[in-house]
Regions:
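Flavin-dependent oxidoreductase catalytic cores
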Residues: 1-122, 126, 134-137, 142, ...
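Hydrophobic, well-ordered secondary-structure elements that form the walls
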Residues: 17, 40, 52, 177, ...
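Rossmann-like dinucleotide/flavin-binding elements
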Residues: 113-145, 150, 185-192, 196, ...
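Rossmann-like dinucleotide-binding cores of NAD(P)H-dependent redox enzymes
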Residues: 141-180, 252-299
Length: 329
């Protein structure tokens, strides 16, 4: 099951079966954390815990749990990108978002550097954190520059409660950097900062694209990522999300859950969530239906006007009422 489904969703079944049989019963289904697994066993709901994806994310899951170091477990975030989608649905060899060495354990094994040096990493998002940690494990003296806060856009990605699993990934990556002695500098790196290092890794991330149409600079038009945080913008009423990729879809779902908003997705491609995982498609399509989110595909935005978003839909110009517009292009 994907991260949008509660963890341990099959435990009730294991508990019910255990009451009726005299043989050992296994509980399974999104049991990703040691404390949760222990809680199930201690409560008598099951005799054993069965897991699959967590062992792909970290094959030493059980060892680290047994030794009392759950903070060192690379967590399964139930994204299903590399395992279920790639393995089951596409028929390719599996990989893992949280474990880049999966399937390449020999080729990507971490060995001490032949010549340890001073390494700078620019950017404290997931790529920068992983690069800094890997360099530190190889024996380099690592300094990580981050102008905002460690985790980068993982903060926005994990803001919706239905994506809380990503918070585990962020906590793990930050913990490993701290444990392995990476020096963190909270500032934007400039050339003078980097000249003294033997090597520089650029992991500065990307900047969301805008919308090159008239009215895109209106006060009620903002980037979708500006809403996905604690102090983010919280408009109500008619909300239009321009862009039906994963970020746009998640933004629309989030606002449909927060209040009695009327939310609309406008996507220029023939379908929303193009290129996203099958699991995300299934879950979000269901949430879109349940929360009555309107979706326009093959729709080209022409302008953002005072009354709403003007778009070309089916060869005709149409005005979609909007009190606020979020860009997820």
């Amino acid at each position: 099951t994907p991260m949008q489904i509660p963890r341990g969703h099959n435990v009730w079944a294991a508990e019910a079966i255990k009451k009726e049989v005299s043989i050992p019963v296994f509980a399974t289904g999104s049991i990703t954390q040691p404390d949760f697994a222990e809680e199930i066993l201690a409560s008598g709901k099951a005799d054993f815990i069965s897991m699959g994806r967590p062992l792909l994310a970290d094959p030493y899951w059980a060892k680290k749990a047994m030794e009392g170091h759950p903070e060192d477990i690379s967590p399964c975030i139930r994204c299903n990108e590399g395992c279920l989608d790639r393995g089951n649905h596409i028929g390719k060899s599996i990989n893992c978002t949280m474990n880049p060495t999966l399937g390449f354990e020999d080729a990507l094994a971490i060995h001490p550097a032949e010549k340890p040096g001073k390494i700078a990493v620019v950017g404290g998002g997931p790529a920068g954190l992983k690069a800094a940690d890997t360099a530190a494990l190889r024996g380099h003296e690592v300094t990580l520059f981050e102008k905002r806060c460690l985790g980068g856009y993982l903060h926005e990605a994990s803001f919706p409660e239905f994506k809380a699993d990503i918070r585990d990934a962020m906590k793990y990556l930050i913990t490993q950097v701290e444990k392995h002695g990476v020096k963190v500098v909270k500032k934007e790196a400039v050339l003078e900062d980097l000249e003294k290092f033997d090597g520089v890794i650029i992991a500065a991330g990307s900047v969301p694209a805008g919308l090159p149409v008239p009215g895109a600079d209106r006060e009620n038009v903002t980037l979708a990522v500006d809403a996905l945080k604690e102090d983010g913008i919280r408009p109500t009423g008619n909300i239009v999300v321009v862009g039906g990729g994963l970020i746009g879809t998640e933004t629309a779902v989030q606002f449909s859950l927060e209040s009695a908003n009327h939310v609309t997705i406008v996507e220029m491609l023939p379908e929303i969530m193009r290129g996203c995982s099958d699991c995300d498609h299934i879950v979000y399509q269901d949430m879109i239906r349940k929360n009555h989110i309107a979706v326009y595909t093959s729709a080209r935005v022409l302008a953002v006007e005072e009354e709403g978003v003007a778009a070309e839909i089916g060869g005709c110009r149409r005005l979609i009422p909007a009190d606020h517009v979020f860009l997820a292009t």
